[in-house]
């Protein structure tokens, strides 16, 4: 019921390790892999991990408890439309990390059978273009009174240029693209 993290997602953790933020918001946390890796590697960092899937949140909380990171990771039921107020201790986040759905509806049928048959569709498919979840997130981030200092997103093949435009339109000045492990 929860997406299995891929090696490419490690890029988001690497960004956090480079920036060494005090507060991180992990949007679409799934099983909590990103949030927990950041909290484990950066003991001074406070992480809020949010998702709309109750199944994912149960897995993320169980993983948080199993790793003993509950003092630094808050697992919260919250969606993109309710980012305001998610800050730990009322402080703005230094970094927002997100591995949101980015597969288009048309691409779904072409995915490998082991993905289509065993991964939750809602964790992968964003809508007709594949950019809908990222667009919604960036629109809400742009509305925040206190925006995070940096945003790192995992996006699909061929989406980077479009997402760079969306990030720029959301008011983030410096935008950097990185290739993943594949």
Indicate where each model-derived feature is located.
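Acidic-residue sensor for enzyme active/binding pockets
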Residues: 10, 41, 114, 119, ...
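Class I S-adenosylmethionine-dependent transferase superfamily signal
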Residues: 38, 115, 137-141
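Conserved Class I SAM-dependent methyltransferase catalytic core
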Residues: 128-182
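Glycine/small-residue-rich loop that forms an oxyanion/phosphate-binding "nest" at active or ligand-binding sites
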Residues: 4
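Helix-to-beta-strand junctions that scaffold the AdoMet/dcAdoMet cofactor pocket
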Residues: 69, 119, 144-147
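Mobile active-site "lid"/loop adjacent to the S-adenosyl-L-methionine
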Residues: 100-133
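Acidic catalytic motifs of isoprenoid enzymes
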Residues: 1
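Conserved SAM/SAH cofactor-binding pocket of Class I
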Residues: 8-110
